Each structure stands twice: as structure tokens, then as C-alpha cells.
Amino acid sequence: MFGGELDDAFGVFEGKVPKSLKEESKNSQNSQNSQKIKRTLTDKNASNQEQGTKKLESSVGEQESATKRAKIENLKDNQDLIPNNDVNGIHINNSAVADTKHKPKIGDIAADDISNEVSIKNEGDTIPEATVADSFEQEASLQVAGKVGMTEAKSSTEEVVELRHQVRHQVSIPPNYDYVPISKHKSPIPPARTYPFTLDPFQAVSIACIERQESVLVSAHTSAGKTVVAEYAVAQSLRDKQRVIYTSPIKALSNQKYRELLAEFGDVGLMTGDVTINPDATCLVMTTEILRSMLYRGSEVMREVAWVIFDEIHYMRDKERGVVWEETIILLPDKSHFVFLSATIPNAMQFAEWITKIHRQPCHVVYTDFRPTPLQHYLFPSGSDGIHLVVDEKSNFREENFQRAMSALMEKQGDDPAAMATKGNAKKGKTGKGGVKGPSDIYKIVKMIMVKNYNPVIVFSFSKRECEALALQMSKLDMNDQTERDLVTTIFNNAVNQLSEKDRELPQIEHILPLLRRGIGIHHSGLLPILKEVIEILFQEGLLKVLFATETFSIGLNMPAKTVVFTNVRKFDGKTFRWISGGEYIQMSGRAGRRGLDDRGIVILMIDEKMDPPVAKSMLKGEADRLDSAFHLSYNMILNLLRVEGISPEFMLERCFFQFQNSLEVPKLEAKLEESQQHYDSFTILDERPLEEYHTLKTQLERYRTDVRTVVNHPNFCLSFLQGGRLVRVKVGNEDFDWGVVVNVSKRPLPKGQSNEYLPQESYIVHTLVMVASDTGPLRIRSGHLPEVHPPAAEDKGKFEVVPFLLSSLDGIAHIRVFLPNDLKSQGQKLTVGKALSEVKRRFPEGITLLDPVENMNIKEPTFIKLMKKVNILESRLLSNPLHNFSELEEKYAEYLRKLALLEEVKDLKKKLSKARSIMQLDELNSRKRVLRRLGFTTSDDVIEVKGRVACEISSGDGLLLTELIFNGMFNDLTPEQCAALLSCLVFQEKSEVENQRMKEELAGPLKILQEMARRIAKVSKESKQELNEEEYVNSFKPSLMEVVYAWAHGASFAQICKMTDVYEGSLIRMFRRLEELIRQMVDAAKVIGNTSLQQKMEDTIACIHRDIVFSASLYL
């Protein structure tokens, strides 16, 4: 059936695609190696992949040298065909990487599988580069009715709106590969799988790649239909009696995917660590961590795998777990082929190049910006009664509507937006000027959605507690009829009946059912897993009309809604409150619109602060996040690579995506360096020496003044002078706010969960009346984070506002105070104080007198007095410098600074270029190896010792620390209950505000030994030049749940342990399951050294925690 569809898909392009492509051999620089390093490599079938050099048909021109990015010379017609403006042509970097013909030996592979040795290419050797070919683009269209959206006006004047989208294809080809353009592909008859619907063009192209036994990356929006491609790969493998592995980033997604594939194909197994079902099945669903473990252990299963499907491959950029994807992809054999399913990523072709480089096989990229259900994006200004369409289904940004929304927001904020400064999100329960009580914003939005029949709706919030609070606000609404309520109760009771009677009485279970019966759900990581699954099932069945969820709901799970609402446009990322990125918005808003059910998806953003049009456009129409490597070394990785024959940690570093991406920067950096160097060399300044001396003097003075400012702004010295009406000079970074008037001073609140105190100069907030840019919006303090505000530009008249600044922003405290009225809410009162400030500045044209730090502020420390003397001396030197009164000083000095900036740029580029040419993270690898040698995990020749083999078994916790504790006899005298409690320190990562005040002695003792051992490891690490903060390392082992785990292991009920901590129930269960996984690894570690007593103790430890709701089975299984 695919033959006809492919003819339709490719027929238009037959005249465009084939042009002759010439290949050139390039010189490769091998970054660190001056001699040939021989490696024993495996996979005897790889030699069959060698083919003679042939001309490849392609739509690209000649490829240039390896030191320059490949260009496409003959793509005038097709230049726009590269997905998302990827650079024309593709360059596979050869720096420091072995161009081997075979895969390294993984695990204990039979001797007859070991092939001949191949050496890494040295400088001067030639390695043919991979090329990119078969680039084409197809435009498809979708028609939707031009009907009324959520506003009263039509989104389009047309009766029918035609929406166009592109399907783009490229392929990265290894050298000497006999490639046939995909337009000439003919599908087999019959195909491996047929569908009762017409395939979308991107699906047909992707399936054609699979039929050709060639890897493919499918990059498309959520709900576009990528699963169809994965299912075809499974069906083809089952037909050909070949093993296929389906990997996903999270266990919940693996469970759900297992259920779907089992229903579709039958011969399906599951391996997640927690559960193993039918491990001999032809199709195995597993987490990526399990696949990596199988590769390191040389599992027999891997010898039979023809296809590996990586779902949600964009998860590879995750800082913590993304490295697992890279390890796995590198370790997989070359004979396996891959299907990568991804959200839209702008550098998809770069990823395909990397796959071609490390596995010497073609990798196609099929990219589409197709949305089966187009989206309309609305803004809801806080406190208003209407929404504004700002981006229509054709992706047009409606500037006029955006400005209306901003005007409505400013009007509703009242005359004093800063009055809301410390109230955070309290306004969500208010509307109108002055904060008159009324229905909350979310209540109004949900009610409007229900009235207009735009449910089901997912309401995204970035806080678990806010999810629950907003859901409770909806409890007056009843969105289900009696039949639906009864059905919800039946499904819910059937699910929780597997729990014990005590567990069914947990508050979370009892309190959520009334909400579910009303059609209101909650979904976040703090929920009990069984409740999350029940809610997912109810939502899929249409029994929940409103779902309040955190961002994690947007990952993987295929549960679209008709409408998506964002309660905030800012999120806390662990450091600051920032705008949602374009990639995050795309991922979450992609849940709007159900294919086949809705002709449009609706997205509503609740906004509570002014947003500039560029910010809104970058969020609503921005590019998806790039797929950038998050590769980092770990001791477990290094030890496993040292243990396995034929590969090494250097092997991993040379082939990782991180190294590949950095190497691609070399040509750009070289070009930029050459340009900057030429610019610097041609930059001449007459009589430069005096300017250099003047600059040195001024820089030194500025440094001393900064030191003075740090002392003066210490709360102990300045707080008593910061009364209301005091004049202060404010400077934030390079932005000068000039003089302002102190309104009041308040203690800066710590963000929730942050235990580290601020620096003294950052621990207080000075609310100051200053002149700011005219377009400044509401100024709120969010969990201790100050709003972004700017002084008026030269052409801007500006306006007076009360702005929160840190003490560190004060650049001077004046002698003078002005009268301050009791109330500064109105703009008129602010203007009155502003006029008084202007009058003071007029009366002191030479400058307002500052408080003297020594005489007035009484700072008498000898070191400070010395510092002040240095400042005075340097100031007098600067004033007596011949250039000080030079009429052209400002112009000449600015010119000198430009030259200095150029010099810094050249130095910086040289450093970056040197770094890009070398093997990344090699210094860190060497320092980690020194640590392993000093602790006795490896020999001086990097041969793994017994300690190292034990540590190889432990991947769910700190392998070094646990191995040291095992060999130290730490667990010999502990009971199983104590073992469980102590090991919880290594798996609990969340923050808890309830710390153990008085820990039981039987727990405090082992904890102290663990911390002492951690300090020893930290000391050895620092001595080995490993960057490690000792206190941070020791504090990373959190004892917050030791008492909780100890009580559970002694038989306490789940309800009892929940009362002992503020940690969410779902987080507790997740911790217990990770703990069990770690203890199982401890059992394996004990087996390695033949310690049967430790093995038995760890098995007893599992027995005392493995019970009840903590380990209840998934509803998907």
C-alpha cells in the first residue's frame, strides 16, 4: 500500500533530487595521540559493510575540507530545504576519533567474534567524510473551518482556512555507501503493517527508511503521529523474526507503552528494574538504564537485536540522565538500526551526522512542523474578564490584540502595581482595581471553557501545591453527570481495591475521590503512583474535564486535551524566576488539540505582569530547544569501560555527542579568530602608553572603591541610616539609576527549600523611589527574586516607581533626607517626591554630599581605614594625571577600551579553539583516574581491582562511597533496618523542611561514619585535582528520611510515616523504589566478593521494606 503513497510523496521531486556528488578524502587531526593506539574490536559482520567507493546521487554540491564546514554550492533551488536553517551540507568531524571498521567488544563475547585489530588514525592519515544527500522538502496542507474561536470574532474571515506545513528530508551517508535516493524506493508487497487511514507524508517517508533497513530520526510535534513509525519498525521486526527493543525515559511511560504494544502485537516483554515480564519476547520494552546495563554486561539479547527504538530522544539533553542515552547509543553494535522519535529540534541533522560517524551507517532525518490540530494562542490578563487572540492558527502574531491585553493588564493592576510586591500569586483570587474580592481568575477561565464546550482542559502549573490549591477552587463546579460520576467511582474503587484497607484510608486517596467525581483531576510527582495512573485512565476515558498538572505531565504520555491553560508565564529553574522558554512552551502547549476530534486546539496564558512583544513572540512562536549534549563523566561509567575488553573511557570521550558538537565549532572559531586578529592588528592608537597608564590607575581605583562599597553596604553599618526619605545612589551592574529616595527596608525572603543564607549585602531589600523606563510593568518579588527593571533610555522621559533593590546595589548614601508622605500609591504622590529629589540635585550641582564611612558611619576597622587611604591616594593620582583634563579624553579612552576588548576577544577565541580541538573532559578523566588509583579501585596501569568490580555493580547510588563502606566493614554490625535507613541518604534527592532534630543513636552513629568516609573521598578528590566542594559533597547525602525509612522497615504503616515528614507521598514511594533498586545492586556487589553474610543481610533489608502500597503493581501491567 505504500508504493502509491510514496509515489505521491516523491513524484514532484524527481527532477530536483539527483546530482552527482564528489567525495574527497580529508586530513584528520588526531587530538592527543602521536602514535597508533591499537584496539581489539568486535562484530565480525561489520566487515561486510565495506563497499567500493561509488558516486552518490544527491542534491548537494562538492564537500570542502575537514577544517571547514561543508558547503553546498549547487543548491540555489533547494537552499531552503535544510530543516530549521541547519548549515548547508554536513560535516562529520574526524578529530581524535578512531575510524574503525568494527565495534568494540562489549561484555564476554565469544573469541571467534573478535576480528582483526584496527588502529586509530593519526595526524596525516586520511579519513573520508560522511556526506549529506537526498535533501528535499514537500509542502502539505490541512483545511479547517474558519469558525469562531473562544472569542466572539472569527479567527479568520474565510469560510475554510488552509494551513500549510513542510515535510523535510535529509540523510547523512557514510563514506563508500551505495546510497539509492529514497524517491526511488518501492515498498514491499505486502508491507509489514497496514493502517486503516492514509499516512501523513512524514510517516510515509519515515516508514520507507525503515523498509530500506536504514536508521531514521523523526522530528515532529507532540501528537503528530510519530508512534505509527515506531509500530512499523516493531511489525517489521516481528515479521522478519528479529529482536526489537523499545526504550523510553521513564518507567511510567515504559509501562504504558508495554500495554499498548502488547495489545497490538502480543509478543512483547517488559524490563524496567522493578518489573520483568516475558524477557524472551521478540519485542522488549525497557528503560534506557536497563539497556545500558545489558550492553555493559554483554547480554546475549544484544546479539539478536536488529532495531532499537528510542522514544523521546530529546530527553538526551537532560542534565542528570541524558548521558545514559549517549552511553547506550555509542555502545550499541553497528549492525543494529535505530528509530529515534523526537519533539521538534532545530539541529536534528547534527544528531544524524553523529550517528553516521559512530556507527558508519546512513541516518535519515524526517522533519515536519505539522500539527494535526492547529493551535490558537490567547492571553488572559490577570483580573480581567476576557481573553485576547494573539497568535492564530496560521501562526500570525496579532500585535494589536497583544497591546490590548497589556493595556487591560495595566488597567486592572491599578495605579500602584508595586503595591503587590510581596503578595506573589495572591492576586489570583482578586479582580479589578484595589483588589475587590471576586471569583478567582482560574475559576473564570475554567467556567468559560465549560460554557463554550472547550473541555477537556489541562491547566499547567509549576508548583505541586498550587495544582492542589487551584483544583480546590474548582470544587464548587460539577462537570460530570450522574452516570459519569458513578463510572468514576467504579473505576477508582476497582483500582484501589488492590491496596490494603489501611492504605485505602490514606488522606490523599480519600480526599481526591470527591474531586474526581466532579470531573476535576490533579497530576504531579507528589501523588501516589496508583492515583496518577487512575487519573490518567479517567482522563483518557473523558471522565475528567479539567486536569491540574505540573510540567512533567507533558513528557511522553499521550494524553491530549482540547484546551491547555498556563497559570504562569514564569517558572523557577532552581536559581531564578524566568520566562518559559520557547521549547518548554511548545512541549506543553502541544497537548492542546485532539487529532480527529478537534479542528483547533486552544492555548490560554494567564499573565500577571507586563510582557514585551519580543518576549511574547519568542515564547509563543519561538524555536524549539536544541538537542545539546549533557554528557558528563561518572565513576561508574569509567569503571565499567575499564572492565570491558577492547574499549576505554577515552573511547567514550572521543565518540560522545559532546565531543562531536564541540569539534563542529572549529571552522567557525577559526574564521572568527582570523577576523578578530586582523581587526586587532590593524587597530592602531597614537601615543598609546599614557592611555594604558591611565587605564591601569582607573581600574585599580575602581577595584578599591568596590571593596569600600562592600563594607559600607554591610547591614551592620548602613541599615540605621536607611530611614524613609534618605537619598541613595543606585547602580545595578552597568545600569545607573542615579539618585533615589528610600521608602522602606525589608528582610529578603529565602526561596522555598533554600537553606543557604544570602550574603549580608544581599539579605535586605531597599524599596527605593527611582526613575525607571516608561514601559516598566508590575514589580513583584517572587520568593526572594527581584524583578528585572531598567533606567529610562536617553529618549525616554521615564516614570517614578518604588523598586526593590538589594543593599549591594547602593552606590552612595547621602547626608540629605526629603519629606516622604505616608502613602506612595498614586502616581501623583510619587511625582511630588520626585520633584523634591530633582530640587535637591539642582541645589547641589557639584554633587550631593555622601555620608563619610569613617566619620559619619563610624566604621573604624584599621583595615578599612587603610583601604580608604589607598582610595584617596589613587583619586589624587588620577586627578593629577596629565590626561585627566585632556579635552579628547573620553573619545580616546573609549577607543582604547575597544582595542582592549578586541584583545580579550582574541584571547578568548584562542582558548575556545584549543578546547574544541582537544578531547573534551580529558583532564577530568585523568583526575578521576587518579582518585580511583589512590582509593585502590584500579592499578597504576588502569587495570580494575576487586574494589572497582564491586563499584561497577552500583549505579543507583555513590559507588565509591558504598564500596569504601563495604570494605570498611560498615554494614557488618548493622541490622537490616539500619541498613535501609542509612542507604536512604544516597537515594533521596529532594528538599525537606523537616530535618531530624534528635536522631536515634542507632542511626546517628552510622550516619557519622558515612559522612567521615565522604570527607575522606572528598579530600582524596581534591588532592587528585578533581573539582569538588567538600561540604556540598557531604551534604548531598541527605539524612532527612532516615527516621522515616527506619520506622517503615520496623513495620509502621504508610499513614504513620507520612505524618513524620513534609515530603509528598508520591516522592516517598519513589524514594523507596529507588532504595530497593540500590539494595538489589548491593546484593550483586556482595556476590562479586563472595560475602554471603552481607548478601543475606541485604536480601533481608529488601524483605523488610518491600510491602503494601509502596510496591503496589502498576495498573498498566
Curated annotation (Swiss-Prot):
InterPro entries: DEAD/DEAH_box_helicase_dom, Helicase_ATP-bd, Helicase_C-like, MTR4-like_stalk, MTR4_beta-barrel, P-loop_NTPase, RNA-DNA_Helicase, SKI2-like. GO terms for biological process: maturation of 5.8S rRNA; polyadenylation-dependent ncRNA catabolic process; RNA catabolic process; siRNA catabolic process; TRAMP-dependent tRNA surveillance pathway. Residues 65-79 have a biased composition (Basic and acidic residues). Residues 19-86, 414-433 are annotated as: Disordered. Its EC number is 3.6.4.-. It is found in: Nucleus. Coiled coil: none annotated. Residues 441-642 form the Helicase C-terminal domain. Its main location: nucleus. The keyword Nucleus applies. One of its GO terms (cellular component) is nucleus. Component of the TRAMP complex which has a poly(A) RNA polymerase activity and is involved in a post-transcriptional quality control mechanism limiting inappropriate expression of genetic information. Polyadenylation is required for the degradative activity of the exosome on several of its nuclear RNA substrates. Required for heterochromatic gene silencing at centromeric repeats by either exosome- or RNAi-mediated degradation of heterochromatic transcripts. Belongs to the helicase family. SKI2 subfamily. Component of the TRAMP complex composed of at least cid14, mtr4, and air1. This is ATP-dependent RNA helicase mtr4. It comes from Schizosaccharomyces pombe (strain 972 / ATCC 24843) (Fission yeast).
